[in-house]
Swiss-Prot record:
Domain of life of the native organism: Bacteria
Protein name: Exodeoxyribonuclease 7 large subunit
EC identifiers of the protein: 3.1.11.6
EC category: hydrolase
GO cellular component, one term: exodeoxyribonuclease VII complex
Subunit structure: Heterooligomer composed of large and small subunits.
An individual GO BP term: DNA catabolic process
Primary gene name: xseA
C-alpha cells in the first residue's frame, strides 16, 4: 500500500513541477475573456479561450488595480501570467500579472483616453469653432492625389461655385509617414491665405483612418487659423479630427457642398433682389412725381415774391439795428473820452486817447466790413433763391412762348384729355385767349 500516492500528494507533486519549470513562470497568452467575474475582494476570475481550448485564470487585486481599462466579457486580450495548479480542485490555471486589450480594442481604448484629454482642454468646444465663408475665393483641398475623394470634391465645387479657385495639395492619408505629412500640409495650406481648407479621404477601417486620430494631427487642425472642414471616411466613420475641425462633413461630396454656395440658388436670389429693387424705384419715383405736382400747385410758387419778401424786410431791419448799435457804442465811447479829458490832464492822456481812438476805429472798420460781408452774403443768397424760384415760376415759362391750357378751370396736360369742339382758355404772358378744339392729334398717331 505504500506504493500508492494520495490525491493530495500527487497534486502537490504536479504543482511543484509546474512551479519549478522556468518556462511556465512567465508566459504570454492571447485569447478571449469568458465567464468574467469581479469578486467583492477585488480579485478577478475568468477563463481565457480560443476556438479549441479554455484555461481558467485569476488576477489578484494588486495587479487588477493597475489596469487602465475595465475588462469585460468577450474582450480580446494579451496576458502575461504564470502557470500553476490550484490544489483544492487539482486543475491547473494561470495567474495573470498584466493584461491589455488586443488589436482594435486597444485602439479604441487609446481613442477614448485621448478624446477625454482633448475635451477637457477645450479642443472640441463649439465656442472655438470658426464660421465657414459663404463666398470663398480660394479653397485648399488636402487629400490623396488619386481616388474618389478628390474627384467628388473637384466636380462638386465646379458644378456649384466655379468662381472658387481650388488648390489641390496632395497628401498622404494612410501609412506610417501620413501623420507628419498631414500636419505639414495643414500648416502649409494655412499659410496660403485661402478662405477654406477641406481635409478628407475615403472610408476605411479604424486602422486605415487612425492618422486622423493622432494627437498631433488633431492639434494641428485645432490650431489652424483658416476654417477647416473635415471629411474623413464615410458617414458612419468618426475621428477626433472631425471634433477638432470647424465643421464635420459626412462625405467628401458634402464637404464641397458645405464649402460653397449653389450658383443657381444665387442667381435666383439676385433676380429676386433685382425685381424688388425695380419695384421700389418705380414706387419711389411715382411718389416723388406726385409730390412735385402737389408742390407746383401751391399759391406761393405762383407768386414767388411771397417767399422772400419777409426775408428781405427782416434783413433790412437787422441791418438798421446793427448800424444803430454801432453808432450807440461809438457815442458811448466818445462820451467816455470826453469825461476822461475833463478829469485828467489832456496832454498826459492824449497819447492813450489816440491809441484808444485808433482801436475803436479799427474795431468799427472790422464791424463794418463784417456787416458788409454778411449783407453781401445775404443778398447773394437771396438773389440765388429768387433766381431759382423765378426759374420755377409759370410766368417765366410763359415768357419763353409757352401757355397754360385750361378746360373748365382744370389744367390740361395731355391730348388724351381733349375732344373736338372743347372750349379752352389759354393763359399767356400778357393775357388770356379763348380757343376751340377743331382736331386732336396724338404723338403716336
Amino acid at each position: 500500500m505504500s506504493d500508492y500516492l494520495s490525491v493530495s500528494a500527487l497534486t502537490k507533486y504536479i504543482k511543484y513541477k509546474f512551479d519549478q519549470d522556468p518556462h511556465l513562470q512567465s508566459v504570454l497568452i492571447k485569447g478571449e475573456l469568458s465567464n468574467f467575474k469581479k469578486h467583492s475582494s477585488g480579485h478577478l476570475y475568468f477563463n481565457v479561450k480560443d476556438k479549441e481550448s479554455v484555461i481558467s485564470a485569476m488576477m489578484f487585486k494588486g495587479s487588477a488595480s493597475k489596469l487602465n481599462f475595465e475588462p469585460k466579457e468577450g474582450d480580446e486580450v494579451l496576458l502575461e501570467a504564470r502557470v500553476s495548479v490550484f490544489e483544492r480542485r487539482g486543475n491547473y490555471q494561470i495567474y495573470v500579472n498584466k493584461m491589455q486589450l488586443d488589436g482594435i480594442g486597444n485602439l479604441y481604448q487609446k481613442l477614448e483616453a485621448l478624446k477625454k484629454k482633448l475635451t477637457e482642454e477645450g479642443c472640441f468646444d463649439k465656442a472655438n469653432k470658426k464660421s465657414i465663408p459663404k463666398f470663398p475665393k480660394k479653397i485648399a483641398v488636402l487629400t490623396a492625389s488619386t481616388g474618389a475623394a478628390i474627384r467628388d470634391i473637384h466636380s462638386t465645387i465646379n458644378s456649384r461655385f466655379p468662381l472658387a479657385e481650388q488648390i489641390q495639395i496632395s497628401t498622404l492619408v494612410q501609412g506610417e509617414k501620413a501623420k507628419d505629412d498631414i500636419i505639414e500640409k495643414i500648416e502649409y495650406a494655412d499659410s496660403l491665405g485661402v478662405d477654406t481648407i477641406i481635409v478628407g479621404r475615403g472610408g476605411g477601417s479604424i486602422e486605415d483612418l487612425w492618422n486622423f486620430n493622432e494627437e498631433a494631427v488633431v492639434r494641428a487642425i485645432y490650431n489652424c487659423k483658416t476654417p477647416i472642414i473635415s471629411a474623413v471616411g464615410h458617414e458612419t466613420d468618426f475621428t477626433l479630427s472631425d471634433f477638432a475641425a470647424d465643421i464635420r462633413a459626412a462625405t467628401p461630396t458634402q464637404a464641397a457642398v458645405i464649402a460653397t454656395p449653389d450658383q443657381y440658388e444665387l442667381l435666383q436670389q439676385i433676380q429676386q433682389y433685382q425685381f424688388t429693387l425695380t419695384r421700389f424705384i418705380k414706387k419711389h419715383l411715382e411718389q416723388q412725381r406726385k409730390h412735385v405736382e402737389h408742390l407746383s400747385s401751391y399759391y406761393k410758387f405762383k407768386k414767388p415774391t411771397l417767399l422772400y419778401d419777409q426775408q428781405i424786410q427782416r434783413r433790412d431791419d437787422l441791418e438798421k439795428r446793427l448800424k444803430q448799435q454801432i453808432q450807440a457804442t461809438f457815442e458811448q465811447q466818445r462820451h467816455r473820452l470826453m469825461l476822461l479829458q475833463q478829469r485828467y490832464n489832456l496832454k498826459a492822456l492824449l497819447s492813450s486817447v489816440n491809441q484808444e481812438q485808433q482801436n475803436n476805429l479799427q474795431l468799427t472798420n472790422q464791424l463794418v466790413k463784417l456787416l458788409n460781408s454778411k449783407i453781401l452774403s445775404y443778398k447773394n443768397d437771396l438773389k440765388n433763391k429768387v433766381e431759382n424760384l423765378n426759374n420755377l415760376s409759370p410766368t417765366n415759362t410763359m415768357l419763353r412762348g409757352y401757355a397754360i391750357v385750361n378746360k373748365k378751370d382744370e389744367v390740361i396736360t395731355s391730348t388724351k384729355d381733349l375732344t373736338e369742339n372743347d372750349q379752352l382758355t389759354l393763359t399767356m404772358k400778357d393775357g388770356l385767349v379763348d380757343a376751340k378744339v377743331t382736331k386732336v392729334r396724338c404723338n403716336n398717331d
